């Protein structure tokens, strides 16, 4: 067996009896019961945290919104987190933005698994819209300033001068 301590940067190895199954003895988390029915509140909080770390000029974003079951208060333990992003950047900014969201999505999915015991493989469902989409009221753009089932705007990171 090898025991690692990343904080100290040290490892110890020692011999043990071979396991019969040939598999490592990785301890998997036990099945957990969902903590409560506040799934939408947790998702809203995490959407706000995500948005607060998002730099508009770096990624070419005019706005970010949360929508769907999180806004409606009906999200369950397996629900995704729907984000609507008003994007005006370059192709490179788009690629970087989607990678940034992928990192958040996988991290949030792991946190959700530890809270609920449900695996999702990714928690974010990101929809990009453009100025043209908003002008034509196409796609998800109709959610912005909608009378029924509107997308809720999120505060992004402020520019520091």
Positions of the model-derived regions?
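Acidic Asp/Glu-based divalent-cation binding sites
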Residues: 80-82
